[in-house]
Amino acid sequence: MVGIPSLRVLAVRRILLLSFALLPTLVFAGHGDTSVEPLEQPSLHALASAPSEAELRATIEKLISFGTRSTLSDTKSDTRGIGAARRWVKSRFEAISHDCGGCIEVVTPSQMFTGKRIPQSTEVMDVVAIKRGSGDPKRVIVMTGHLDSRVTDVMNATSDAPGANDDASGVAALVEAARLLSKQDNSATLVFAALSGEEQGLYGGKVLADYATAQGWQVQADLNNDIIGNSHGQNGVLDNTTVRVFSEGTRSTETDEQAKYRRYHGGEVDSPSRNVARYMEQVAEQYLPDLRVHMVYRTDRYGRGGDQVPFLEAGYPAVRVTEGHEDYTRQHQDLRTEKGIHYGDTIEGVDFRYLARVTALNTVTMAAMSRAPVPPSGVDIEGALATDTTVHWKKVPGAAGYRVHWRDTTAPQWQFSRAVGDTDHAVIKDVVIDDWFFGVSSVSADGYESPVAFPGDAGSFQRSASAVTKP
């Protein structure tokens, strides 16, 4: 009996047939012999294996030693509480800066807050390391994690709250990324920020987003790392090869007019944040073959939030990086043992080899983005009532060429692409505009490629006018 091909097999066949059918008919305008292709980068391969498990462990052990890091805890003691933890992280950044000849500036932006989880006016302070870019210093790539910790009662500021995974793991990763990237060249500015106030209401993310706006930063991406060190799920799954990257589908700052345009022209799954997530997936595929990025089409886990949200609300692209399988007995728990189950966020729940791989993903992503040009702006397409599609964009500084990408409208990742040289448009012959999504990336002379920018406001990496004018 002859078997019937599965739907998946048929889909793969369809894609292969389409690719063979389409490739011979592609004609691009203006590229000649000047096309620049993205290149495999040996320096990124070296970075991928550089994170130190020993460094990560030392940072987490030190943060745990402060007992609790609740935002509401002691700020005066040198041995216990959020104040001591902040000062230690600041000293660690300063030591890294000393080792690179002062290449890193350390700042501590803060604001006073009261709220549902902050009953009395409290200073929320972030500790931020800034490595200025050599070519495009106003363009900024940010890595964040939150320094504060909690137990079952979020208002309990005195009980021990080790917060080894939530989120000393994220802080350890960004400190290690700062150490490694302090020794590397970067055209765009790199920012590594240990935030406070996350557990009380994402206040530290707001402090940093407001600081970025006040400084005139052009934030290309915030990579928010929160709960990234555990490989043992509560459901019994052991998986040290998967990391989740959450990203919003439509921009948080989208206006009614922009939403109306998007509904008819597409862009529901192509915010700049979503294309940052796709970029991270490609980075992992190319440089970290033992780590799979699982893209999740949500801003965050169901009903939950993280410090990427204030960035999104400020109009900046941002994603959340989180372990593949969470264990809720180790999150937001009083330290205790019940019915043979050990509750609490202790260091025993951290897989340091896994944490090193997730740290590498962030480090390589930041390095690659910072060396590539900014994504193209002004991307637009035309081709209604035609069999060809024309893609337009504005040239950007530092780009030696551009690459046009397209994919089936139901495909999660870009499927096809072609280098088109140093031009501002391309005509794709025999590719009907109705059936595909399109985007454009920029490529440097030495082969570093930017994330893909989707056409229109829906996919633009530029901060939206609605966010700029927001009071």
Question: What are the roles of these predicted feature ranges?
Answer:
Residues G32-R80, R330, E338-K339:
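N-terminal capping segment at the start of a domain
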Residues E55-R132:
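A non-catalytic alpha/beta surface segment that caps or lines the substrate-entry region
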Residues I64, I228-F246, M295-P373:
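Active-site-adjacent mobile loop/cap segments within catalytic or ligand-binding domains
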Residues A129, M143-S149, D153-L202, N362:
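Alpha-helical metal-binding/catalytic segments enriched in His/Glu/Asp
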Residues L195-G306, A314, A318:
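Metal-dependent peptidase/peptidase-like ectodomains
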Residues T387-G398:
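Conserved aromatic anchor
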Residues I428-E449:
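Beta-strand-rich modules
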Residues A445-P471:
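Extracellular fibronectin type III
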